Amino acid sequence: MAAAAAAGPSPGSGPGDSPEGPEGEAPERRRKAHGMLKLYYGLSEGEAAGRPAGPDPLDPTDLNGAHFDPEVYLDKLRRECPLAQLMDSETDMVRQIRALDSDMQTLVYENYNKFISATDTIRKMKNDFRKMEDEMDRLATNMAVITDFSARISATLQDRHERITKLAGVHALLRKLQFLFELPSRLTKCVELGAYGQAVRYQGRAQAVLQQYQHLPSFRAIQDDCQVITARLAQQLRQRFREGGSGAPEQAECVELLLALGEPAEELCEEFLAHARGRLEKELRNLEAELGPSPPAPDVLEFTDHGGSGFVGGLCQVAAAYQELFAAQGPAGAEKLAAFARQLGSRYFALVERRLAQEQGGGDNSLLVRALDRFHRRLRAPGALLAAAGLADAATEIVERVARERLGHHLQGLRAAFLGCLTDVRQALAAPRVAGKEGPGLAELLANVASSILSHIKASLAAVHLFTAKEVSFSNKPYFRGEFCSQGVREGLIVGFVHSMCQTAQSFCDSPGEKGGATPPALLLLLSRLCLDYETATISYILTLTDEQFLVQDQFPVTPVSTLCAEARETARRLLTHYVKVQGLVISQMLRKSVETRDWLSTLEPRNVRAVMKRVVEDTTAIDVQVGLLYEEGVRKAQSSDSSKRTFSVYSSSRQQGRYAPSYTPSAPMDTNLLSNIQKLFSERIDVFSPVEFNKVSVLTGIIKISLKTLLECVRLRTFGRFGLQQVQVDCHFLQLYLWRFVADEELVHLLLDEVVASAALRCPDPVPMEPSVVEVICERG
């Protein structure tokens, strides 16, 4: 218990914890203190007593209860708890008392500071209100004094105020009379000094009074003098106006003064427009002089600035002054001004169009668009002043016309660039090859052409996109938001160029002897691949790029991408087919000459393959390499294992030599012809000019079919001796050894070469074939 005594109330304990509280402290106050402590620790009444919630509210041992009795509680603890538990309870109670004491001190200090602050604030407010009350009292006293003085002054000056008012009226009347009597002298002095505006204002101030009192002799004399002076003033103003030496504002001032003096408005209107016409025509002559051939013409931007500041600025001044001076003329006067502006505006527009026409050959649109922007902006002001003249609409039409011409110019530029690329390709293909230095291949030439054309297209799109830039004044016009984007750029420029490119490429497929006859086959192959690339990717790319840059906001019909792709694919197919025909005809020409220029009846026994056959194989190999640079391999049928070992008999491979050779004698030609015709009935029909696919195998197959078909037809027209037949047999075997690997189906080569040998046998009086082993030896040696 000593520890409990040591831990007694501290000096800072709150009143609720001290046993020295007020003597009359009520039980209700104690209950509130206990309730605050319970809320602070978050305990219910039962938990605070260490027993389950919901105790008997009349229990005297409940620490938090309203009927707590400390003596009963202590007796209970002494009876029920051992000494150790009592010591623990004491220690816990001391700890709780100290904690509660600290919390109570904190609460007291915090509330005390707030109370002190509130007290100071209230004291300050009382002092301020006390000063304010004193000031309000002094203000009320001063207002009472002022009111008293004001009443006394009003009472004193009431009679004098009436007299002063009368005297002021008399004084004003005297001043007016003095002004009237001095008016002639004032007008004369103003005219002598050139102060015409002041003189007109004087006359305007006195005219109504003089008109009203003109029946009085004195006023009549003043009016007569003023009329004489006014007439002289009007004459001088007219003279100054007619001289025209001053600028437009001064002339407008003269007209305004003349109108104020009562001069006829119709006559002044005509004279005003006539003088304005002279000044504006002078500006037009200056602009026309800048277009002359002798001095170097200024750039289009400078020309537009001159026209805008000179003619257009002058026209704006004339229109503004006319509408201000002659507003009373009504619709007739407005129409007269509109006709005046239309007549001069048409001449100005003609000069501007002449200058803009000189810019059509240039490739840069930036300067031209800036000039058109300034031209269009400067005509907004007269367009607003002269809505009936339609100057703004005419200016917009000029801008639209120039934009259309620029689109046509860029289309021609793209066509010229494409033709220039083709010329470069021709020169590269025709250039002699330097020993040890490889020239550009077809793939490189194709890449150069494609990139060059694409860069020109992008440059053209960027150039015409300047017409739709947001900072350009005319870009919000309906034409540039709709038709220019869809019909002008997309259809006219891009789609038009694709059509033109396809037409130009197809023109190389003309019949021999015309343009197509001089076209290098490699150029046909390159153009075919270029059109195929356009069909697969480029057309979609450039149209997507165009649609993204030029947001179309109208419903004009446009060409679908699929239509352009189909046209490009058809062009590529025609070019590739023509390439096959040209290359096939080149080889066919060699074979035809080799057959027609040889005496097959007097031919010696064959010892070698003819050189023309070697040339055919070499050219075919070169074509294979050339086509392989641009096209994929393609698909071949499964090849037989003996393709390079097969030899030709006198007849086709379907007929055994031992079976038919003994029966072939000069006495039995009908039997041999019959057998050949029967064999043809069961052979597969060969379509020489079948459609060509976009791969190397299909191209080589078409060329070889044309070549071998030509050889077959030439052989059918010749007569062969025994050794001539054997030479054909050797040549065909040599061709078979090398040509089968180029075609899609090797049976095609076998069939055609069988036909060649069989036809030669039919045209031979003594068809004795060479042994296959000998043929193989000769071909291997060759």
UniProtKB/Swiss-Prot annotation:
Cellular component GO terms, alphabetical: cytosol; EARP complex; GARP complex; Golgi apparatus; intracellular membrane-bounded organelle; membrane; nucleolus; recycling endosome
Coiled-coil regions, chain positions: 116-147, 270-292
Keywords: Acetylation, Coiled coil, Disease variant, Endosome, Golgi apparatus, Intellectual disability, Lipid transport, Phosphoprotein, Protein transport, Transport
Annotated spans, Disordered: 1-37
Domain of life: Eukaryota
Localisation per UniProt entry: Golgi apparatus, trans-Golgi network; Recycling endosome
Biased composition, class Low complexity, residue ranges: 1-19
N-acetylalanine, modified sites: A2
InterPro entries found in the cross-reference section: Cullin_repeat-like_dom_sf, Vps51
Residues the record lists as Phosphoserine modifications: S18, S44, S649
GO BP field: autophagy; brain morphogenesis; endocytic recycling; Golgi organization; Golgi vesicle transport; lysosomal transport; protein targeting; protein transport
One Pfam family matching this protein: VPS51_Exo84_N
Subunit structure: Component of the Golgi-associated retrograde protein (GARP) complex, also called VFT (VPS fifty-three) complex, composed of VPS51, VPS52, VPS53 and VPS54. Component of the endosome-associated retrograde protein (EARP) complex, composed of VPS51, VPS52, VPS53 and VPS50/Syndetin. EIPR1 interacts with both EARP and GARP complexes and mediates the recruitment of the GARP complex to the trans-Golgi network. Interacts with STX6 (via N-terminus). Interacts with VPS50 and VPS54 in an EIPR1-independent manner.
Homology family: Belongs to the VPS51 family.
Its job: Acts as a component of the GARP complex that is involved in retrograde transport from early and late endosomes to the trans-Golgi network (TGN). The GARP complex is required for the maintenance of protein retrieval from endosomes to the TGN, acid hydrolase sorting, lysosome function, endosomal cholesterol traffic and autophagy. VPS51 participates in retrograde transport of acid hydrolase receptors, likely by promoting tethering and SNARE-dependent fusion of endosome-derived carriers to the TGN. Acts as a component of the EARP complex that is involved in endocytic recycling.
Linked pathology: Pontocerebellar hypoplasia 13: A form of pontocerebellar hypoplasia, a disorder characterized by structural defects of the pons and cerebellum, evident upon brain imaging. PCH13 is an autosomal recessive form characterized by delayed psychomotor development, absent speech, severe intellectual disability and postnatal microcephaly, with brain malformations consisting of cerebellar atrophy and hypoplastic corpus callosum. Additional features, including seizures and visual impairment, are variable.
Protein name: Vacuolar protein sorting-associated protein 51 homolog
Organism listed in the record: Homo sapiens
